[in-house]
Amino acid sequence: MAGHSKWATTKHKKAVIDARRGKLFAKLIKNIEVAARTGGGDPDGNPTLYDAIQKAKKNSVPLDNIERARKRGAGEEAGGADWETIMYEGYAPGGVALLVECLTDNRNRAASEVRVAVTRNGGSMADAGSVSYLFNRKGLVVVPKEGTTEDDVTLAVLDAGAEDVNDVGEAFEVICEPSDLVAVRTALQEAGIEYESAELSFIPSVEVPLDEEGARKVMRLVDALEDSDDVQNVYTNADIPDEIMAKIS
């Protein structure tokens, strides 16, 4: 189980994380609130909530903020918005497929902000279903390389349902079916292997290779989308080589 996945914008996000820490905190808090509302406020009985809390902790969200979000979602504390998940589809420059996942309390505002960000940066919106078929819904666990090897990770997750382990530079990505995400994450924990995040994602079935100019255009559009408070995640099928990503980050 090897290979090299460049579809994610994870490394790019890390490069701009300091400038956007406030926005990142807000999005992580929103994830906790929605997970608690959907599956209950007990992380032990709600794997999605557990993973949302762990991700927030690893991104240094204050524990008090995390607990308040959990309580709001579970109905133990007043407040909290009526969040709605909406997926928008489109194309970035160069024919790169684009999935934009929003979590919003105002559908009209979200649609407007996504449309403006896409069209002002050389992209175009697409009808529902015309882009999403290029992606598969998968579980994704990111494991930092420090202190572990690809063989260590592979051995730990092989019997837990993992489909692939990819070396993506500073980390390994473990890909699995959504139903196997908890088993894969648990297998890593039992093997004593630290992981950075465990969540559902969209993995492209076909990638579009980009040169530096094309990569800059696509990442400019992604940045514009991620500036919106309503946008939770942006998925593309761009294939950007490491050396180009390092230049433009």
Curated annotation (Swiss-Prot):
GO CC, alphabetical: cytosol
Chain ranges passing through the membrane: none
Pfam families in the cross-refs: TACO1_YebC_N, Transcrip_reg
Protein origin, superkingdom: Bacteria
GO biological process, one term: regulation of DNA-templated transcription
SUPFAM superfamilies per record: YebC-like
Gene3D superfamilies: 1.10.10.200, 3.30.70.980
UniProt cross-references to InterPro entries, sorted A to Z: Integrase-like_N, TACO1_YebC-like_2nd/3rd_dom, TACO1_YebC_N, Transcrip_reg_TACO1-like, Transcrip_reg_TACO1-like_dom3, YebC-like
Location(s) in or outside the cell: Cytoplasm
GO molecular function, one term: DNA binding
Keywords: Cytoplasm, DNA-binding, Transcription, Transcription regulation
Stated family: Belongs to the TACO1 family.
Name of the protein in question: Probable transcriptional regulatory protein Tfu_2096
Organism in which the protein naturally occurs: Thermobifida fusca (strain YX)
